[in-house]
From Swiss-Prot:
It catalyses: L-threonylcarbamoyladenylate + adenosine(37) in tRNA = N(6)-L-threonylcarbamoyladenosine(37) in tRNA + AMP + H(+). The lineage of its organism: Bacteria, Pseudomonadati, Pseudomonadota, Alphaproteobacteria, Rickettsiales. One of its GO terms (molecular function) is iron ion binding. Fe cation binds at residues 112, 116, 307. The gene is tsaD. The keyword Transcription regulation does not apply. It is found in: Cytoplasm. This is tRNA N6-adenosine threonylcarbamoyltransferase. Belongs to the KAE1 / TsaD family. It comes from Rickettsia bellii (strain OSU 85-389). Required for the formation of a threonylcarbamoyl group on adenosine at position 37 (t(6)A37) in tRNAs that read codons beginning with adenine. Is involved in the transfer of the threonylcarbamoyl moiety of threonylcarbamoyl-AMP (TC-AMP) to the N6 group of A37, together with TsaE and TsaB. TsaD likely plays a direct catalytic role in this reaction. Keywords: Acyltransferase, Cytoplasm, Iron, Metal-binding, Transferase, tRNA processing. Substrate binds at residues 134-138, 167, 180, 279.
């Protein structure tokens, strides 16, 4: 049975996973760096890279032990090779290449975004094509997933990623890092209609998004307040999250229009992937929104929304099955669009 070892190190989570050709996740070890970055309330690239270097071997040993697998049983090694914080990407890629060379196993460079894009095929085995909303700390885009390595970006943020907006607003409210889950938790206790925030380019008639102005509006409000208490924090979090939901709901309908123009898709599946996909409020909102238009919204389990190596291993499996191996002289990339794969 084929077993793929996946490595993920593009940001602040060190992860190693082993999956089988039957899409069974035998192990998916994630070593978080939240404590290392907590004081900075954001990811420090140099600290992240050093932590990946210190944690990768430990994560691999745990993955092998948990899956009851030896290195000799590994069929191929897949690693995130971009986009991402280049220090961490290089650490993970070089680790994978070294294993590939020593074990004489194929190396497969995986685009981190492709890993997110294909997660629903790992978990739900959905067919191509489908519409994807990739929403994370570094990216926010609508993508037509037409096949393996065949992606068309329909629209994207013109400034900040939606996950970045969550984290920055959390920082403004002095909430712990990572901020996204903290905003969601506080929003449950607040009034989503308390503060009216702008929805930049919501009526632009395309699939592009903007979150910078929203972030600025939140900062302006906070600076205007004489005091900040828990009630105010909860109301700001709820109003901010509500506004994000309004923007994404509007734009996903625009994306459906464009998607239907370029594909004869009768599956009518929409996938939301990336860290923001773990937000339960947005899951329910977008699910109801798309259901009205005859689409099913699919989102991975929470553990597979955030960065993980299982999705990298699965992307590696699809590439292995199609004979798409990578030479060891492949250079990791800080920037790497899905359309450039």
């Amino acid at each position: 049975m084929k077993k793929i070892l996946g490595i993920e190190s593009s940001c602040d989570d060190t992860s190693v996973s082993i999956i089988t050709e039957d899409r069974e996740i035998l192990s998916n070890i994630v070593i978080s760096q939240n404590t290392e970055h907590a004081d900075y309330k954001g990811v420090v690239p140099e600290i992240a890279a050093r932590s990946h270097l210190a944690n990768l071997e430990k994560a691999m040993k745990q993955a092998l032990l948990e899956s009851n697998t030896s290195l000799d049983e590994i069929t191929a090694i897949a690693a995130t090779s971009g986009p991402g914080l280049i220090g961490g990407v290089i650490v993970g890629s070089m680790f994978a290449k070294s294993l590939s060379s020593v074990l004489n196993k194929p190396f497969i460079a995986v685009n981190h975004l492709e890993g997110h894009a294909l997660t629903a095929r790992l978990t739900d085995n959905i067919p191509y094509p489908y519409l994807l909303l990739l929403a994370s700390g570094g990216h926010c885009q609508f993508v037509a997933v037409l096949g393996l390595g065949k992606y068309k970006i329909l629209g994207s943020t013109i400034d900040d990623a939606v996950g970045e907006a969550f984290d920055k607003v959390a920082k403004m409210l002095d909430l712990p890092f990572p901020g996204g889950p903290k905003i969601e938790k506080r929003a449950k206790l607040g009034d989503p209609y308390k503060y009216k925030f702008p929805k930049p380019i919501i009526n632009s008639g395309d699939c592009n998004m903007s979150f910078s102005g929203l972030k600025t509006a939140v900062r302006t409000l906070i600076m205007s307040l004489q005091e900040i208490n828990d009630t105010i924090i909860n109301d700001i979090a709820a109003s901010f999250q509500f506004t994000i939901g309004e923007i994404l709901s509007s734009k996903i309908l625009e994306a459906i229009k464009v998607y239907e123009q370029i594909t004869n898709d009768f599956n009518r599946n929409i996938v939301i992937a990336g860290g923001v996909a773990a937000n339960k409020y947005l899951q329910e909102l977008l699910s109801n929104c798309t259901k009205i238009h005859g689409y099913q919204l699919i989102y991975p389990p929470t553990t597979l929304c955030t960065d993980n190596a299982a999705m990298i291993a699965y992307a590696g499996l699809e590439r292995y099955n199609n004979g798409l191996f990578t030479p060891l002289n492949f250079c990791p990339k800080a920037r790497w669009s899905l359309e450039e794969i």
